[in-house]
């Protein structure tokens, strides 16, 4: 499969609509409807210039819509999107499906987002993961990466990134690393690989929005003034149609508090749990703000690094359970793939082949 060269551009965020009573909303809707009808527009056809002027009234699609019959060992499920764009005043059309894979790289992060035309990698595991991760991505037929992003400069997030960048070389469009300058050999290797590639290097800025085919992704946080590297993680919200994902890197409760105060729309269907499920992440108030149906934890098995770091923490798992959030863990299921058609999410899990076969 070929991956086209797509360029990002900053887009205007949706205008916030003032809240009114239901009666006023209905009256406004009917008024616009009759104006459009008198102008010769058919039912359901709205001129593009009117989109920002209309506040759509629709029933929310909250809540799971039943189970997919999948592998009983993986707990495959299908759920509708909580983030109903009709309620927010926009209708987004997408074509095809988008895959978001939380690749099993042990006590580390590597997230691959792709469809038939575009691909984006967020983090790349530890140093030994670089070549196996590259082999796995290539085994999917992906020969071009639109974006490669390192959420912060810890080895378990950028360790394998130099291998990925070197392997794809001229087939990487954009590279984004944290502005927090690192001092480790791992960091220097990634910077050297980025400098040697033909990719344009992007500077992360909170609020900036980019495109990935029909998907958009926005940087919500990248504060390098935080005292800890984890707290300066680049936090990204990805939206595809009426579905959304929040990727938090190793964000802590301090980062989460800043996000809650930022004014950004945090509500997302899927939450990548911060810092491998550590006790210092995933606060109750943050879960209230995000309101995810699904949470994914990228972590090593308890017999290995996970036990050393006590990840995921019992307290974090309890908070997720108390909020009624379905949890998927890479140490239990392997690589976790969530596929979106823009309206519903399908979850599957499998052992990752990293030998390129």
Model-identified regions with their sequence ranges:
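Non-globular, low-confidence helical/coil segments that flank catalytic cores
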Residues: 2-10, 25, 33-357
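N-terminal Sec-pathway targeting helices
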Residues: 15-33
């Amino acid at each position: 499969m070929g991956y086209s060269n797509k360029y990002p551009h900053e887009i205007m965020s949706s205008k916030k609509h003032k809240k009114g009573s239901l009666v006023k909303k209905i009256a406004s809707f009917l008024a616009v409807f009759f104006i459009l009808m008198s102008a010769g527009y058919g039912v359901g056809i709205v001129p593009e210039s009117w989109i920002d002027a209309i506040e759509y009234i629709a029933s929310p699609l909250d809540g799971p819509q039943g189970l997919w019959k999948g592998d009983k060992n993986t707990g495959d499920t299908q759920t509708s999107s909580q983030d109903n764009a009709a309620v927010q005043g926009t209708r987004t059309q997408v074509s095809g499906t988008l895959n978001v894979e939380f690749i099993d790289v042990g006590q580390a992060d590597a997230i691959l987002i792709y469809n038939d035309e575009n691909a984006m990698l967020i983090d790349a595991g530890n140093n030994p993961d670089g070549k196996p991760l590259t082999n796995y991505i290539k085994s999917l037929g992906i020969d071009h990466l639109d974006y490669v992003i390192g959420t912060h400069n810890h080895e378990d997030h950028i360790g394998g990134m130099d291998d990925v960048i070197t392997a794809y070389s001229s087939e990487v469009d954009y590279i984004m690393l944290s502005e927090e300058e690192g001092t480790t050999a791992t960091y220097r290797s990634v910077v050297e690989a980025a400098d040697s590639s033909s990719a344009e290097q992007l500077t992360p800025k909170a609020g900036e929005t980019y495109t990935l085919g029909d998907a958009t992704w926005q940087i919500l946080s990248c504060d390098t003034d935080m005292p800890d590297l984890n707290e300066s993680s680049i936090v990204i919200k990805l939206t595809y149609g009426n579905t959304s994902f929040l990727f938090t890197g190793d964000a802590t409760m301090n980062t989460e508090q800043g996000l809650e105060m930022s004014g950004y729309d945090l509500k997302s269907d899927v939450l990548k749990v911060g810092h491998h499920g550590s006790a210092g992440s995933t606060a109750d108030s943050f879960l209230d703000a995000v309101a995810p149906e699904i949470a994914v934890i990228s972590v090593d098995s308890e017999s290995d690094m996970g036990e050393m770091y006590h990840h995921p923490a019992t307290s974090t798992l309890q908070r997720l359970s108390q909020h009624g959030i379905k949890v998927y863990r890479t140490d239990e299921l392997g690589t976790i793939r969530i596929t979106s058609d823009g309206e519903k999410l399908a979850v599957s899990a499998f052992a990752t082949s990293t030998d390129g076969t």
